[in-house]
């Protein structure tokens, strides 16, 4: 590997160490090299975007280890540019919030994200966006994970009576 990359074996080892710190499982065998055993469980930008088949959603991804809220960062971006479909992800939020500015605990281990959308429909339909988004999330969870979540009015997704997701819309 060091010959192909034209770097020292120590440099390869340091890079492998960095890759492991991102959650990738890498096996090493003396005199043979390294082998990727399993990918990271983190929502890393390149993991999110590599197989996307969308026109605009997720074409740009911002990733943070910790942030106050992904929503605040997304609002700043949205106010300065027209980045439609941009996704903001963080491993942990220190100031997560829900509807009516209620505190929302967002420790490491969850999926904390915001998506910037500039929809092309009449603003009177905006009230339908949270329920439509929650419904789409339920359908995706059921299809991919083969479990049946439920909607709790107006913006929550629950599983066995426990909240697993909430959809918050800011304008």
Language-model region placement:
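N-terminal lobe of the biotin/lipoate ligase/transferase fold
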Residues: 1-143, 163-165
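Acidic (Asp/Glu) carboxylate-rich active-site/surface patches
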Residues: 136-171
């Amino acid at each position: 590997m060091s010959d192909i990359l034209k770097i020292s074996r120590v440099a390869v080892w340091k890079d492998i160490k960095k890759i492991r710190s991102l959650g990738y499982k890498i096996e090493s065998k003396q005199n043979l090299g390294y082998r990727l055993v399993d990918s990271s469980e983190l929502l890393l930008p390149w993991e999110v975007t590599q197989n996307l088949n969308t026109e605009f959603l997720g074409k740009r991804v911002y990733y943070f280890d910790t942030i106050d809220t992904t929503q605040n960062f997304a609002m700043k971006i949205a106010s300065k540019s027209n980045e439609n479909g941009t996704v903001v992800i963080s491993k942990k939020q220190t100031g997560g919030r829900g509807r009516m500015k209620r505190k929302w605990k967002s420790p490491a281990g969850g999926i904390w994200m915001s998506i910037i959308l500039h929809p092309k429909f009449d603003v009177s339909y905006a009230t339908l966006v949270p329920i439509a988004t929650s419904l789409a999330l339920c359908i995706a969870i059921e299809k991919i994970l083969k479990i049946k979540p439920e909607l709790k009015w107006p913006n929550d997704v629950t599983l066995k009576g426990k909240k697993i997701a909430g959809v918050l819309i800011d304008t």
